[in-house]
UniProtKB/Swiss-Prot annotation:
It is an enzyme of class 3 (hydrolase). Residues 424-438 have a biased composition (Basic residues). A motif (Q motif) lies at residues 9-37. PROSITE patterns: DEAD_ATP_HELICASE (PS00039), HELICASE_ATP_BIND_1 (PS51192), HELICASE_CTER (PS51194), Q_MOTIF (PS51195). Residues 394-438 are annotated as: Disordered. GO terms for molecular function: ATP binding; ATP hydrolysis activity; RNA binding; RNA helicase activity. Residues 40-219 form the Helicase ATP-binding domain. One of its GO terms (biological process) is RNA catabolic process. Keywords: ATP-binding, Cytoplasm, Helicase, Hydrolase, Nucleotide-binding, RNA-binding. HAMAP family: DEAD_helicase_RhlB. This is ATP-dependent RNA helicase RhlB. It holds the Pfam family DEAD.
Length: 438
């Protein structure tokens, strides 16, 4: 959770329980973001909500605050065992579930409520032991939650609050049957507080809300533009021959504090990682086949600043809350227009500014018209000077040549490239575009 001061509304203005206010204020959260200011009065009145807001706007804190407050003000059902959750928060990815749990920790400490995680790719027995020690709030992905349910580790008879986060992403990943399976085993919608949040309130998302919620109020925070007004967008048209050199030259010119590079395939991501690691950049690789423990370690290194650049497929485009990402590079333009918005939305979050640089190369330039139509504006274009591109670049590393360097390279330097063997880049690759004649 990131401290923001975007509205004049304070959390203390809403009549929250003192323990909730205490947890928020100890982490420095005093003022609300727009989605928090709109959602909390609705939720605190007991009304269900279907909220639409871009990632990075503070919706996680909105539903966590409402969930904790609801559990504190609503008596637990009579006969409920400590192993039976009172609230359930469903997320589309393991990373998002973990991030929600981490964001909940200040409120767990101040309220005394217990939370547990349930997601695949992690030890079943370890999660089972945590659940058996008592749980008020269950946070996780639908598949593992259903596994525990079918093993009768818990039931859902005493659920008093439900959160469905990134609902549109749930549809994209094919989890809708799992969601309906879980909803049908909970108390009636009128007997629980229901919260749905989504980047888009599409027809299918609204249909889900109508089916499993109690007349939810729609709360929408529309951005001025789909891509966020704090994000500086830039587009290059590199040849396939120049593409990698342009990326490395721009990285050396921009020298980003924290950057994510997106490519469309696992193989392309591995190629980018190999070139940047060879050039002594502190770079991590995040693709779909990375084991969960390694994913968590890579993300922690990136968040802590031990890794400066993360190369990723769209597995990281949504559901990850990584603060202070300064640059996003679209090495490949995505095939899905919405993925462009979600990718560059990793930067320019919570009031910060960001820079997005995209390559319309020979292979993926065909995707550009649809993307620009979707975001309703043309992406500003820059030319580059081929003679200004770096040429003395080392050969790429072999991804599997060294177990120690697989997936992450934290041995690079922020102050020099290639161990100081190459002079710092002096020539700017950008070339001014000629002005159009009237």
């Amino acid at each position: 959770m990131k401290k923001t001061h975007i509205t004049e509304h304070k959390f203390a203005d809403f009549g929250l329980q003192p323990q909730v206010i205490d947890g928020l204020e100890k982490k420095g959260f005093v003022y609300c973001t727009p989605i928090q200011a709109l959602a909390l009065p609705v939720l605190l009145s007991g009304q269900d909500i279907a909220g639409q807001a871009q990632t990075g706007t503070g919706k996680t804190l909105a539903f966590l605050t409402a969930t904790f407050n609801h559990l504190l003000t609503t008596p637990a059902a009579e006969g409920r065992a400590e192993t039976q959750p009172r609230a359930i928060i469903m997320a589309p990815t393991r990373e998002l579930a973990i991030q929600i749990f981490n964001d909940a920790e200040p409120l767990l400490a101040s309220t005394g409520l217990k939370a547990a995680l349930a997601y695949g790719g992690e030890s079943y027995d370890k999660q089972l032991a945590k659940l058996q020690s008592g749980v008020d709030i269950l946070i996780g992905t639908t598949g593992r939650i259903i596994d525990f349910y079918k093993q009768r580790v818990f039931n859902l008879n005493h659920i008093q609050a439900v959160v469905l986060d990134e609902a549109d992403r749930m549809f994209d990943l094919g989890f809708i049957k799992d969601i309906r399976f879980l909803f049908r085993r909970m108390p009636e919608p009128k007997d629980r507080l229901n919260m749905l949040f989504s980047a888009t309130l599409s027809y299918r998302v609204q249909e889900l809300a109508f089916e499993h919620m109690n007349n939810p109020e729609h709360v929408v925070v529309e951005p001025e533009q789909k891509t966020g007004h704090r994000i500086q967008e830039e587009l290059f048209y590199p040849s396939n021959e120049h593409k990698m050199a342009l990326l490395q030259t721009l990285i050396e010119e921009e020298w980003p504090d924290r950057a994510i590079i997106f490519a469309n395939t696992k193989h392309r991501c591995e190629q980018i990682w190999a070139h940047l690691a060879a050039d002594n950049h502190r770079v991590g690789l995040l693709t779909g086949d990375v084991p969960q423990k390694k994913r968590e370690r890579i993300l922690e290194q990136f968040t802590q600043g031990d890794v400066d650049i993360l190369v990723a497929t769209d597995v990281a485009a949504r559901g990850l809350h990584i603060p202070q990402v300064t640059h996003v590079f679209n090495y490949d333009l995505p095939d899905d227009c919405e993925d462009y918005v979600h990718r560059i939305g990793r930067t320019g979050r919570a009031g910060a500014s960001g820079h997005s640089i995209s390559f319309a190369c020979e292979e993926y330039a065909i995707n550009l018209p649809a993307i620009e139509s979707y975001i309703e504006h043309a992406i500003p274009t820059s030319d580059y000077d081929p003679s200004a591109l770096l040429t003395d670049l080392p050969a790429p590393l072999s991804l599997r040549s060294s177990p120690q360097q697989r997936r992450t390279n934290t041995a690079g330097s922020r102050n020099s490239n290639n161990g100081g063997n190459r002079k710092p880049q002096q020539r700017r690759p950008r070339a001014p575009r000629p002005k159009k004649e009237a």
